[in-house]
Amino acid sequence: MANKKEKSVTMPTVTDAGAVQEDVWIPAVCHAQCVDQGCLMKVHRVNGVAVGIEPNTDIENYEKLVRNRGKLCPKPYMLLQKVYNPHRIKTPLKRTNPEKGVGIDPKWVEISYDEALDTIAAKLKSIRGSDTIKLAEARGTASIRNEGWWAFLRSFGPTQILWGGRSTHCRQAQHAFGDRIHGGSACVPDLDYCNYLIVIGANPAAAGGAAENPLFAKARERGMRIIAIDPVLSATAAKADEWLPIKPGTDCAFILAMINIILHEIKIYDVPFLKEMTNAPYLVGPDGYWLRDKETKKGQVWDPVDGRAKTYDDPGIKDFALDGTFEIDGVKGTPSFQLLKDHMKQYTPEWAAAETEIAADKIRRITKEFVENARIGSTIEIEGARLPLRPAATHVGRGITGQVHSYQTILADHILAILIGGLEVPGSHMGGSTFAKGRRSKEGYLFRGNGMSSGVEVGEDGMQDTHHRDFQWPPKSYSGWEMLIPFMDDHPYPKPPFDNPAESLYSMDHIDWLNLVDPPKGLPVPPLPEMWIRHRCNPILALGESKYAIDVLKRIPFTVSISYTMDEVTDFADIILPDQLELESLVPIFAIREAGHRKGFMIPLHQPIVEPLPNIMNINNVLAELALRAGFIDEFNVQMNKVIGFGDKDPEKLEPGKKYSWEETVDKKCKFYTSGKYGLEWFKQNHILVRPVSIEEAYDIHFNMKAKKLRYPVPYMEVVKRTGDELNRNLAGKGIDWWPTDEYTALPVYFAPILEEAPKDHDFYVVNCRVASTSWGANVGLPWVNEISAQLRGVGDVLMNAATAKKRGIKDGDEIWIESTTGKIKQTVRLCHGIRPDCLLISGQFGQWGMPVAKETNRASISTLLPISIAWTDKMTGNQQWIAVKAKVSKAK
């Protein structure tokens, strides 16, 4: 056990100067500081005051079974300053100035919780059950993890989305198409066995957090090579064996060239895997669709031994043809693998070199090393199970998915994986999980994974399910996302007829706000909401062109903000409810197993460490109380039962006619997850249930695909082409011509980066990153965060290539103007050599003007430079182009 005094962060200014009556370490979970799920920690409490935090290493075999393996990123330590922040909102507040706007004093007055809740409930009651949706909501990661938030929205009825950041910062393309290809909403390499890793558009060393970094460290100790492809010498690139400074926006070209080299130069690929585990042998007709058997309507393959077409599941198949073209009943059919080979001829290394500005010989060498390290055909025995071994993988991140055309890159990345047979096997491209809906152990304990992953779902033609939404007119949401991006939905969640935009985790946040100000031709945008409730998100800062969010917020009649300090958005609120913080809250973190950690399952409880401030309620209790006062507590209980997973006959389910406290609900959830064995008090005393993961669970997608005789729906995404054709016809029928569908391709196609459409004098690529300490933006209101940022060169400032700066007469520490077509910022410049000469780097989560402490940092945000428009929106995923923008630079006077 480490020495607590040496490792913990202390805050002597808040400790009791009197006698020590209590000195304890309490196990806890960092649960709302990032999108990862739950790092174990413990908090030092003296006389009721939290004074220190360190990783929890008390659990037996923690380095194997616990996801953060005795490590923490900076954010958990900040919770001490957060809970004792002198700028906290400590009581409900009511606006008395009806005029709303930036910098306009709301003239707040303190009110009681009763007055605040009665006021909010009266408004909810008046708009509930209307013909149009009159409530809109905005949530952050912490909200999503509160069962009460989901239960409240579903029980209230249809609710609009007016978020801030989901379509801007999340990895939509990877979530949607990783899920459809191999049941994984987040793709990661299997670092336990990977020997050769290509990192593209990702920076796990800085942003991977406590769970990922130990895995990378051990892999490096084992000898894993890393190739970092990034415009900037990031923390990951600095630790890599090789850094390739790619031109922003051209990552897809690099991967396409790798596929070309494998198919047409190296000519080594995993033939058995392609034949048995993918749709590579499926025959495609001249129209681009599967060539189907006339009687059964099933997809067909060509058996070269018998010399005829057979349905894909014909038990008499002797072999599968991958090459050639065949005639079936007068119609030519070509295996999708042959189409892939033909299609990829255009993407040569020389072509990619011109796009990426990475030399063709380097692309060839990297590809050759990738294939050699994949050890195609090799196997490994783990815990008595014989599995394919493919110790080569890619790791793509927000640098890929934060661009338009991101589906093309994600599809190409998965095709690269299947060529070496490297999908969901040791050492390879991973991410899938069959535990999204949960599975009980033999002891009766329910272990549940990330709910966004569908796992293995039987789909059409013997493949993994590739579901999508049917066309809906008129759309219900402000952006029309449920109509325009049919692949963006949440498969594991209930899917009723779509009438509730808030039912999903996906949206087009930036377009929601835009359409309420400037709706596009022919789209029937629903009316402005009468009420907006917001928790832990900031649409003014998170999106581009803040004028749209500001315009809308000024016009919404009634706004509720659940906030812990004042910020940019609270200026527009009518009622503010204080937010209970992490060290004060009770949170059961019961869905914690994700793809990056395949060793153990955890069911941990985060319990309150310090007494909540006397006038601050837990958000789940707030929402239950609002449901009671607004008259829909019975519906709230029904939906809470569904969210937790209670069945109709489950003894722990919430009954109608009663409002349950959050503590009562958590006690029921604890018993449900342990088949009645352990309740809340047991978890308060024991903190956690943990068990090892079996080999069948660690690689559950592979075992399940084999058991169900399913194939991965690649390389040829016929369903995407078919869906795009349907969407194109439907949109044309409604007179909508501003949403192109040309990206709905079955094979990956390279589209020129939208960045190249900028004016010629915009000669810098402004790229974005984020580091662990400043994620989320609310943390910038903490002095410790800013002290750390000041020690990280470039964090909070803008990084510029030293040679470029010299040519322009710019020195380290100068201020420069950076101007895009939509915004202009002034920022201090820091010079370095580890960045492309034509690039600037701005770290994220800054730009505050309303949050105490943060507004004093005088740091800019790339969001100011980002356009909000249809053109800057990914047509497959709804993601905003936000990872890079082009701008011109001048020295500030």
Locations of regions flagged by a protein language model:
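Long, contiguous, secondary-structure-rich segments that constitute the structural scaffold
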Residues: 4-8, 607-609, 615-675, 782-799, ...
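Extended redox/cofactor-interaction regions of prokaryotic respiratory oxidoreductases
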Residues: 149-218, 222-224, 253, 323-324, ...
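Flexible glycine/proline-rich, aromatic-decorated loop/lid segments
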Residues: 235, 568-604
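N-terminal leader/propeptide and maturation segments of large enzyme subunits in energy/redox metabolism
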Residues: 88-117, 128-129, 267-365, 440-442, ...
